[in-house]
Amino acid sequence: MTYIRKTHPLMKIVNNAFIDLPAPSNISSWWNFGSLLGICLILQILTGLFLAMHYASDTTTAFSSVTHICRDVNYGWIIRYMHANGASMFFICLFMHVGRGLYYGSYTFLETWNIGVILLFTVMATAFVGYVLPWGQMSFWGATVITNLLSAIPYIGTNLVEWIWGGFSVDKATLTRFFAFHFILPFIITALAMIHLLFLHDTGSNNPTGIPSDADKIPFHPYYTIKDIMGVLLLIFFLMLLVLFAPDLLGDPDNYTPANPLNTPPHIKPEWYFLFAYAILRSIPNKLGGVLALVLSILVLILMPLLHTSKQRSMMFRPFSQCLFWALVADLLTLTWIGGQPVEYPFVVIGQLASILYFLIILVLMPIISTIENNLLKW
């Protein structure tokens, strides 16, 4: 008897992607984050849909509609906080997923990696426009400051900013279009994630050793479905811990004040997951230079396959590269901390040093150390 999952046109696709998929027998828990990102995306789309049913994208009613969701809608508070903190969990999983790719050399799957970088940009754009929607002080000023960065583009900058704003300042038109973007982008992310998976299943998964595992494959189900369920339970546990015990831990108190164009908050800063890029932006005194550094801080990931000089794919057997990798992680944590600090001594200097170190490790030190390790192998 042939199973329906192997013959039905739709079931066959699901079967080949999640059930009978040949997977390496030695992939660790670092390979759980792909499925966790899928769960996060589904969770965000569902909670977002229910929030959109009650949200009003107008400058006069946006803030009060969010308040109304929290106070009057049945379980509105939990939906709102699951959505807000779900974004934080999404980015934690994203950073882990990208970090895993860097550590184990998964960037050698060019198509998968490049689609992944595009996905990262799209998720960041979605999170940014979403942060504007509650129309609190930090929403308004964050939108003003970040969109204003585009004015650094020569010749067309000012026109471009006014075009995005839909006027001469962040106003009703801006909020309405940001809501439209925030609604449509997750579906674009879903489509991109499917393409990401399509390219991954074309080559098969990488594994911690970086050695081809064609001779040693096991079916995805039940081995990795069980393993993924464990990850999902942990994700939901930590998410609900945040939502039920400290829902505002990662938010900004200023966002509980309605947006006021006449009153600037003392420290304008984005959500925690953008702080590393924000610190890089602030560390350069020139506006255009800062914007370029900001974009390059993420775009540099595209260059990873070109910067790979090692004869080994993974860092598993490369202790010097491992030291550099963890130095990079420490540097990113430092940048995240600096991004949330005021622009004054010593934070400015620390930010500048951390920014230089970030690009130095990725663009210079990693290729050099990899070459040294290649030569050490000859001894």
Curated annotation (Swiss-Prot):
Cofactor note: Binds 2 heme b groups non-covalently.
Gene3D superfamilies: Cytochrome Bc1 Complex, Chain C
Highest rank taxon of the organism: Eukaryota
Binding site for heme b b566: H97, H196
Regions crossing the membrane: 33-53, 77-98, 113-133, 178-198, 226-246, 288-308, 320-340, 347-367
Membrane-protein topology: Multi-pass membrane protein
Keywords noted in UniProt: Electron transport, Heme, Iron, Membrane, Metal-binding, Mitochondrion, Mitochondrion inner membrane, Respiratory chain, Transmembrane, Transmembrane helix, Transport, Ubiquinone
Obligatory cofactor(s): heme b
InterPro entries: Cyt_b/b6_C (IPR005798), Cyt_b/b6_C_sf (IPR036150), Cyt_b/b6_N (IPR005797), Cytb/b6-like_sf (IPR027387), Cytochrome_b (IPR030689), Cytochrome_b_C_euk/bac (IPR048260), Cytochrome_b_N_euk/bac (IPR048259), Di-haem_cyt_TM (IPR016174)
Primary location recorded for the protein, binned into one broad class: mitochondrion
Family in the record: Belongs to the cytochrome b family.
Subunit organization: The cytochrome bc1 complex contains 11 subunits: 3 respiratory subunits (MT-CYB, CYC1 and UQCRFS1), 2 core proteins (UQCRC1 and UQCRC2) and 6 low-molecular weight proteins (UQCRH/QCR6, UQCRB/QCR7, UQCRQ/QCR8, UQCR10/QCR9, UQCR11/QCR10 and a cleavage product of UQCRFS1). This cytochrome bc1 complex then forms a dimer.
Any further remark recorded for this protein: Heme 1 (or BL or b562) is low-potential and absorbs at about 562 nm, and heme 2 (or BH or b566) is high-potential and absorbs at about 566 nm.
Protein name in UniProt: Cytochrome b
Native organism: Pudu puda
Gene: MT-CYB
